[in-house]
From Swiss-Prot:
Its EC number is 2.1.1.190. Belongs to the class I-like SAM-binding methyltransferase superfamily. RNA M5U methyltransferase family. RlmD subfamily. Catalyzes the formation of 5-methyl-uridine at position 1939 (m5U1939) in 23S rRNA. GO terms for biological process: rRNA base methylation. S-adenosyl-L-methionine binds at residues 276, 305, 310, 326, 353, 373. This is 23S rRNA (uracil(1939)-C(5))-methyltransferase RlmD. NCBIfam families: PRK13168.1, rumA. Signal peptide: none annotated. Coiled coil: none annotated. It comes from Shewanella amazonensis (strain ATCC BAA-1098 / SB2B). Pfam families: TRAM (PF01938), tRNA_U5-meth_tr (PF05958). Keywords: 4Fe-4S, Iron, Iron-sulfur, Metal-binding, Methyltransferase, rRNA processing, S-adenosyl-L-methionine, Transferase. InterPro entries: 23S_rRNA_MeTrfase_RlmD, MeTrfase_TrmA_AS, NA-bd_OB-fold, SAM-dependent_MTases_sf, TRAM_dom, U5_MeTrfase_fam.
Length: 443
């Protein structure tokens, strides 16, 4: 017999009541933290020092969650978010906090989590890598939303904590040329006969122009392709269709791959290849990595999770003998092409799953320096082989401070000391950040 949950009267009353709280600090996801009846309460949108009126939405044994209803006493660091979809769209969650305080919060969060793994207080450099705080994204993936009642299609991003899509016509953190394409693209897609066959739309600003990849779940009619092609040529963008198997079809006149420029180098990438979305910060991040690692001609440097060569090529340009390793075959092939495009012959690339046993890999051996730029899961398995590699310096670029903190324990156990730690503000207006850590062998 099925049993249905029914909230107890007292519990329902507790959740519906509004209470006033004093916010103490922010958590690692950017939510305000307060205390109520001995419990920690998480309040998205609230800032430290504020007195807020909230409604409890969830009660657990040791904590509760609440929805911000009203700010009674605002923090001097609070600002009005310029985005009309702020609070609905799940993209930016710190637009209400001034940029200097965003950076301070991220430095503190990075230092706190790494300090716990180091079992000592770690100082984060105050000269963080940062750039423009608005219109900085050179790539974005927009979801499509087709209203079954009106048969109207909208483009947008996922709603916070939901699979629902919030329709938008511009984006304050997307590069202006891309933001200005959202509304015209939505109008165009609504003219297509096969608009029910459309998936996401990926927009990219490259050094050689604007690129759009439209995902389709079934082939489009020729008349639809003509509309798309005319739109692309009129706006001078490269437009590609991507089918279920990942196959690409150019609908525009230009067939050149997108590329970006870095340290005088040209790095091409295919749609679907990972690149850093913040081009300005990526430039500064790579420059800082070169400075911290201090590579000299002839040194053997291993670049794990190398992608299309974002760090490998600048390292090779400095005269190092570089070995790049990446788990995606297509990106390994692109990295090799990028080396050839730039006339660099002092580097080699290998494809390997860096989460598996690396004992038989031909590239695993003594090196002078190691650079890692893993995905959010980190590089725990790779770092187990430190004793075989014995690099004098390890530079770890992390998009997940929690993974960096966990992995740093392996470095400490292997005799390394954390000598520099810096914030890389790749994603302004959000709680997300990257960290750069330099470890040096003590003995």
């Amino acid at each position: 017999m099925a049993q249905f949950f029914k909230a107890k009267p007292n519990q329902a009353k507790k959740l519906s009541q509004k209470i006033a709280l004093k916010v103490q600090r922010l958590d690692h996801l950017g939510a305000g933290i307060a205390e109520h009846q001995g419990k920690v309460v998480f309040i998205p949108g609230a800032l430290p020092g504020e007195t807020v009126e909230v409604q409890l939405t969830e009660q657990k044994k040791n904590y509760a969650r609440a929805k911000l209803q009203r700010v009674s006493e605002a923090s001097p660091d609070r600002q009005t978010p310029p985005c009309p979809w702020y609070g609905k769209c799940g993209g930016c969650d710190l637009q209400h906090l001034s940029l200097p305080r965003q950076l301070e919060y991220k430095r503190q969060a990075l230092g706190d989590i790494v300090s716990r793994s180091a079992a000592q207080t770690v100082t984060v450099n105050t000269d963080e890598v940062s750039g423009d705080s608005w219109h900085y994204r050179r790539r974005a993936r927009l979801a499509t939303l087709l209203d079954k009642e009106t048969n109207q299609l909208a483009l947008g991003f996922r709603e916070e904590g939901s699979k629902s899509v919030v329709g938008i016509d511009s984006c304050a953190v997307l590069a202006r040329p891309l933001s200005e394409l959202i509304s015209p693209f939505a109008t165009l897609l609504n003219r297509l006969k096969g608009k029910q066959r459309l998936g996401h739309l990926e927009l990219t600003q490259a050094a050689n122009g604007l690129f759009a990849v439209l995902r389709v779940t079934a082939p489009l009619a020729q008349s639809d392709k003509k509309l798309l092609s005319a739109f692309a040529d009129e706006r001078q963008i490269a437009l590609l269709l991507q089918g279920n198997e990942g196959e690409l079809e150019f609908l525009s006149s230009g067939h050149e791959l997108p590329y970006y420029q870095l340290d005088g180098l040209k790095l091409a990438f295919a749609p679907g290849n990972f690149i850093q979305v913040n081009g300005e910060v990526n430039q500064a991040m790579v420059a800082q990595a070169m400075n911290w690692l201090d590579v000299h001609a002839g040194e053997r440097v291993l670049d794990l999770f190398c992608g299309v060569g974002n760090f490998s090529l600048p390292l090779a340009k400095q005269g190092a003998e570089v070995v790049g390793v990446e788990g995606v075959p297509e990106m390994v092939a692109q990295a090799k092409q990028n080396a050839a495009i730039n006339g660099l012959d002092n580097l080699s690339f290998y494809c390997a799953d860096l989460s598996e046993d690396l004992a038989a890999e031909p590239w695993l051996g003594k090196i002078d320096k190691l650079l890692l730029d893993p995905a959010r899961a980190g590089a725990y398995e790779s770092l187990k082989w430190l004793k075989k590699m014995k690099p004098a310096k390890v530079l770890y670029v992390s998009c997940n401070p929690a993974s960096l903190a966990r992995d740093s324990v392996l470095l400490f156990e292997a005799g390394y000391q954390l000598t520099r730690l810096g914030l890389v503000d790749m994603f302004p207006q959000t709680h997300h950040s990257e960290g750069m850590a330099l470890f040096e062998l003590v003995n």
